[in-house]
Amino acid sequence: MAYQIEYAYTCHIGKIRNNNEDNFWCCGDSLETQNQGMSHIRSGYMKQSEYPLLAVFDGMGGESCGEMAAFLAAEACGEHFKTAKDGIRNDPEEFLNEICESMNQAICDYGRTN
């Protein structure tokens, strides 16, 4: 049985910080490194056959460069998804392991050089 996913997302800076330290990846959309969140809610639909991947990178603040960690995770998530999308269909668990390793590597590489 095929199904359709309806999704909606937004990102808000909150009341404490001067910059938003959260990010996401949704159907190719994410925020820039330095951002103030979003001013509105975005929404859409996708078919099951599109093998969707939606990700939230929350709670990466509190340390220096939390916004960079969230951005790098979103960027690596999107890059891996675009190059290895068929992995979701073939072996979802392995795909998630690989994408987590890719995101972690991007953040660790940044930490070593900055």
Regions inferred by a protein language model and the residue ranges of each:
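PP2C/PPM-type serine/threonine phosphatase catalytic domain
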Residues: 1-114
